[in-house]
């Protein structure tokens, strides 16, 4: 649908000097780390990760180790957004499962330490891929990368949320209806101009939600660039801000937007040459691991997923407007609300 939704590794990977509006004094953080992390040593360097438009994320280098600090952004925020406390809770709960997540060291809800609530976790060494075409990889490596990320989301949806203490992490049932309502409210709260396709989707979606219902832990934003790879295996899943209890197929379909949003992913012959599975092949991989039939209502979940990411993009534009965006690249991501909403409505017109 749009080449603008494609991201570039060099632009978003690695760290940079902390943006002026996101700087904080390290003294109180040092005291907090001393109280919560044994043997860390003194803070030597604080850097900001280039990626991550939502919650500002920092690399904290000390004498003996490196850590990642993730905090709420300063300023006016949307209701229930930037929930670092929920991120901390789910990452901590999943640490002993087959889902690869970093070890957490603590949650701090005292604004006086760095200015907003934050949590600290281990720094996971590896590679984050922002370009879904994986231009620096061989066909065999690409196939392995896609196979392994499929395995991880299947593992996540197979975790018994009750056994890991997340029975209170969200409501059970009616996930999609609640999500449509939530993202509609978030979209309208951050609306910067009238978009006809979004208005039509807001009216159409609640009337066409499938009756099937099941509940699992869902990530909410399971993308290639929210994973850390080492030797082409996933060693860390990041950015759990949107996670909750929800519908696994909705979560997986959102993950599959790559095949609908990037032009090169429409060319099956090219994907085959590159070692990348096409949409149906990737969908079948998930079905084989989970036993779930994804053929029914797949297009509805695609429409819902496109609507959701369009609303996320609008939220980014809202933060740009309000001056609270965490990245200088925020606006170029936010403007994708236009092609994404048009793409979603075109599927409605073609299939319903």
Predicted stretch roles:
Residues 217-219, 224:
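Catalytic-loop of the protein kinase fold
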Residues 250-290, 304-323:
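Active-site activation/catalytic loop segments of kinase-like enzymes and analogous catalytic loops
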Residues 2-39:
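Juxta-kinase regulatory segment immediately upstream of eukaryotic protein kinase catalytic domains
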